[in-house]
């Protein structure tokens, strides 16, 4: 829904939808798309608070990744601020991770990919228009989501499973919610 809306509105408004540098934009969008797929995939296996806490590691990780990428040190005030913010996130979400283990790093990998995508936006995509970044990101989400739907159509899994059930046509009410969410996502993210 979002891709045609952005493209049609962008063409009508005379926006330049073509990225200046395709490969850096594509690489950046791969990280962000991977983050969202891991995030939503984890919702079927982990408590929502644990998944959200994993994604909300991104701001702290952005600071560290940017420091490594740019080869500059992190000052004590930024370190303390990031630590306090991260602890605040944990206290608000109260993730019941049931004992830390390797599996708990899966939601954190969404935060890591999201952080890399954010740093890559600044490092690789300087000069790109926001609308070119937005529609190309949404398009990549559409492509990977489409592959998933096609795969599960021909190889349906357990109908009761969150991730492996085949395509189910949404009801009119659900379509209404999907459209509403798409419009507000576009307003919130890009317009």
Question: Predicted regions: what is each one?
Answer:
Residues 1, 98-123:
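Glycine-/small-residue-enriched transmembrane alpha-helix faces in small-molecule transporters
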Residues 77-94:
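Hydrophobic transmembrane alpha-helices of multi-pass small-molecule transport proteins
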Residues 38-55, 130-131, 190-191:
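Structural motif at transmembrane-helix junctions in multi-pass transporters
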Residues 1-34, 113-117, 136-153:
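Transmembrane alpha-helices of multi-pass small-molecule transport proteins
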Residues 1-8, 128-184:
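Hydrophobic alpha-helical transmembrane segments of multi-pass integral membrane proteins
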Residues 10, 41, 58-80:
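C-terminal transmembrane-helix exit sites in multi-pass transporters
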Residues 4-5, 54-68, 83, 140, ...:
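Alpha-helical transmembrane segments of compact multi-pass small-molecule transporters, enriched
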Residues 14-40, 102-110, 159-188:
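Loop-to-transmembrane-helix transition segments
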